């Protein structure tokens, strides 16, 4: 199939479709022979070019430095010129890379030298704003501004803490009652004290201690303080003591330890919140417990009311054992027998029964 010019009808290219090539053996065989001949010619030319390249490489490596002439072969001469240009371009490229790296290093060295010179001038020379640091009025003004900011932050912190403490007291319903036996309550349960400790039933003591420990653990976050590990009481410890009277009697030493830790927590919070005057030396904590008792200290702490203090003997070292001795002497019992003695029960009506696991609440 011939393709001709539509104007002059001159044949410019011969085109065979795929159908004609596949269906005509004459065309297929002839084209295959042409392809085979072209492959042979290409292989011969490729081999010749490879030979020229080898000759040029050998001549360039051996004779070009001595100025000897290459063979009078036009192909060799052309390849020699082309390869020479290629080598020159490669060397120029390598030289340009080296120059670029040198310029980068030179620029970095200059920047570091300038930075070092600036630092030396700052160290050895006078300060830029010398009057700012030597003028007494400027210093006093800056101090006054910092003190004002600190005072504002302090007032905001105290106000926020007071609001949180008021919400906590409202949540736990801390009340003061006109009663000599049970003057203070928390969540409608009596606040335990040394004077009513022997007169309350064990379930009521356990319930009061649980509420007080819950309150003190929440108070730790409000005042942003951390109780010592030996002083901290987890709520699970109180739940493990909940149960029948026999179980409470077996766990009497644990209840005593919780009572001692409660007193320590109250004293720590009152000291951190400056409700106890720290300026006095050798504070007599036995006198404080005698005057305020546990319930009084707890109420003053919850309402942020300062308490009076008294200095004691200088040679007394206050510790947990010393506090245990004070509590035991106030209760009139030995350490191991504080909770094992018979407690006077709050007698209910005679026609009704009650269990030791019942919850007791103060009404009115």
Curated annotation (Swiss-Prot):
Transmembrane segments: none annotated. One of its GO terms (cellular component) is fungal-type vacuole membrane. Disruption phenotype: leads to seven- to eightfold decrease of the renal fungal load and four-fold lower fungal burden in the brain of infected mice. Does not affect protein trafficking. The gene is ATG14. Its main location: membrane. This is Autophagy-related protein 14. It comes from Candida glabrata (strain ATCC 2001 / BCRC 20586 / JCM 3761 / NBRC 0622 / NRRL Y-65 / CBS 138) (Yeast). Residues 38-114 form a coiled coil. Required for cytoplasm to vacuole transport (Cvt) and autophagy as a part of the autophagy-specific VPS34 PI3-kinase complex I. This complex is essential to recruit the ATG8-phosphatidylinositol conjugate and the ATG12-ATG5 conjugate to the pre-autophagosomal structure. ATG14 mediates the specific binding of the VPS34 PI3-kinase complex I to the preautophagosomal structure (PAS). Required for survival and/or proliferation in kidneys and in brain.
